[in-house]
Every structure is written in C-alpha cells, then in structure tokens.
Amino acid sequence: MLDQLTIDSFEPLVGSSFWLLWNGHKVELRLTRAARVMESEAARLKRTAFSLFFLAPLFIPQGIHHLTHDALPEPLDIFLVPVEKQGDAYTVEAVFT
C-alpha cells in the first residue's frame, strides 16, 4: 500500500490524528503538514517525493513505526525521524520517495 500513496492521499488529513502504539500505549501523532520535497527527476520514480510532519507529545526515536488512521484502509509501517523539539512536543518526519 505504501507505494500507492501520494501527497494527495495525505493533504486532506492535515490536522487530524494518527495513532502509534508505543511501549504498550496508544500515542496520538497530529499530522501538521504534508509537503512536496522535489519533483521526480527520473521516470523510475512512481510519484513526486513528499514529507509528512507530525507533532508528537513525547520523543519518538528514529525507526520504523506502525501508524493507523481511521481514513486509511490499513495500518502504515513508516520510517519516522525526530527533527525538532517544540516546547513539550516533538516534530517527527516521514519522507516518501
């Protein structure tokens, strides 16, 4: 499913909640932004690269994480990277190429 998702799949979800299972607890990640990274330069790329930015209430370490959202037909296993601390929250990013 991941290879079929585009930025258009996520733009309507900006501002909504995704859920991550972390240490036995359900953690809310709010999608704050969906942004195009660059135009596809080669025909081998099936989509334009994009990033998703989430706001998390706690530090999420870099790695593959299992996320769910009510609007998506199945859970996503995506690689998240912490990029910034904002007060008591953290911004994490997922890049799709």
Report each predicted region and the residues it spans.
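Short, compact, well-ordered microdomains
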Residues: 64-97
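Acidic, aromatic-enriched beta-alpha/helix-loop junctions
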Residues: 39-71
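Conserved hydrophobic positions within beta-strands
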Residues: 31-33, 80
